Amino acid sequence: ELENKHWVAEPTFKSGSEAEIAPINKPHDLTAEVGTRRDTLDFEVEEAITRAQAIQPGWDRLGGEKRAVLLEAAADLFEEHTDDFLSLCQREAGKTLMDAVLELREAVDFLRFYANEARRQFTRPIILPGPTGEENRLSLHGRGVFSCISPWNFPLAIFIGTPAAALAAGNTVVAKPAEQTPLIAALAVRLCHEAGIPEEAFQLLPGAGEVGEMITSDPRIAGVAFTGSTQTAQAINRSLASRDGPIATLIAETGGQNAMIVDSTALPEQVVRDVMRSAFASAGQ
């Protein structure tokens, strides 16, 4: 049943306007369609940020304990939908079954870890030293709206990891998944909403690079969490630096293709095993 299920990824608050519909095919069989991606229009991006900004103060006031409960509820729902996630990780992202299992485990771990951090850092004030006998308290709060952009090689774990951190801290999130793997992201966002996280607080904005450019250049964005190429991260950094508005946070995880060095002491069978794993594990990464 899951092998033939057709999935859809679309903006959280989709308008009635026509937009591009892109097929999402299996990376190992480009004739097999897994689902479709409905791209986010420019004005829908602007509206999404407006909604996220409007609800952020209330989400922040909710407090760390209540936000933690919602993140834990999302983790529970992720586990209840294990079959859906494992199927999508294999069909949409081309992962092996073992990689799909590890991906889901990491996503659940992220949700539970940041739930604990919400309790630890955002539930009660931190008592600071009072050199002259005064009482000093430090309360941590969210900064505003965060844009989260994730890659295709970890379409669930990284997609949910940075939004979970932002949500735990009292920020709201507009999230753009990789254009190749939006279906996994759409399921993750839907389950977060079912867990009780407001739709305005965590919004999905599928699409190509143009969507990413908009959510990293808007002056209302308080921060960007990006995983991808170093070149793109540098472009985002320049965009944030050149815009009018408060200084934004940039969290960038970037990298490249590593080499494999084999010396004369290596066992041939070990080299073969490791080369095969590097070629096919983690969606070919």
Segments (PLM) and residue ranges:
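ALDH superfamily catalytic-core signature
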Residues: 194-197, 217-219, 223, 230-285
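Extended, amphipathic, non-transmembrane alpha-helical segments
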Residues: 79-85
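A structured beta-alpha segment of the ubiquitous adenosine-cofactor-binding alpha/beta core
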Residues: 135-137, 203-225
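Terminal low-complexity tails and localization/encapsulation signals of metabolic enzymes
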Residues: 1-50, 54-57, 61-76, 87, ...
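Hydrophobic packing residues within well-ordered alpha-helices of enzyme cores
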Residues: 111, 185-188, 215, 236-237
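Structural signal for hydrophobic
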Residues: 146, 170, 202, 221-224, ...
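Short beta->alpha connector loops at strand-helix junctions that form conserved
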Residues: 176-178, 206, 263-264
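Conserved small-residue-rich beta-alpha loop and adjacent elements
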Residues: 124-199, 269
